[in-house]
């Protein structure tokens, strides 16, 4: 399931993050790529002082985890620290798959990948996030402050930037619900019950769907 998350960050929050980023520097991003992806990774990665990084991490992670659609789609168990990535002229990231396991304080299984856009789409050309879905490609270029989450099993790339500069924040999530198909079922049930509540109130149908949602979550969740 691919889910767009609108306005994770407000324009003021985006401007604040960009201002913090300006106090650090960008270096080659190849060091964080898996061995099979180094050859196609051509972007830059932000580095800054610990205090700056903590402010960025706190601001972005807090906004993402409080977003109502993220909560219902991800069932996040743990999350990698955000990486701030920049692609300038000619920069991008060829077709690759994200590493299945990543290490922070512990080993994290990557179930969900997340890209949070920090640059308005009109400020750069190219730079689309392109996903290969069983041979069909879908391209995404969202507004600054918007995010997209998708299964980490997805083959994807970032097209080369042909003008301007593209900045994004990236993270990977281990979910309490490892299977994407099960997360989608839970998400659909959650949306359906919220729609019933909004238009009809707490009906018998709402209670039955809520019961089913809770019991499936109980059956599938890994704690």
UniProtKB/Swiss-Prot annotation:
Keywords of this entry: Dioxygenase, Iron, Metal-binding, Oxidoreductase, Vitamin C
PROSITE patterns named among the record's database cross-references: FE2OG_OXY (PS51471)
Matching Pfam families: 2OG-FeII_Oxy_3, PKHD_C
Cofactor: record remark: Binds 1 Fe(2+) ion per subunit.
Names of required cofactors: Fe(2+); L-ascorbate
GO terms (BP aspect): DNA damage response; intracellular iron ion homeostasis
An MF annotation (GO) of this entry: 2-oxoglutarate-dependent dioxygenase activity
Residues that span the membrane, as ranges: none
Main EC class the enzyme belongs to: oxidoreductase
Coiled coil: none
HAMAP family: Hydroxyl_YbiX
EC annotation from Swiss-Prot or TrEMBL: 1.14.11.-
Limits of the Fe2OG dioxygenase domain: 77-175
Gene3D superfamilies tied to this protein: q2cbj1_9rhob like domain (2.60.120.620), Rabenosyn, Rab binding domain (4.10.860.20)
Keyword set includes Transport: no
Protein name (Swiss-Prot/TrEMBL): PKHD-type hydroxylase CPS_3426
InterPro entries registered for this protein in UniProt: Oxoglu/Fe-dep_dioxygenase_dom, PKHD_C, PKHD_hydroxylase, Pro_4_hyd_alph, Pro_4_hyd_alph_FE2OG_OXY
Residues binding Fe cation: 96, 98, 156
Protein residues bound to 2-oxoglutarate: 166
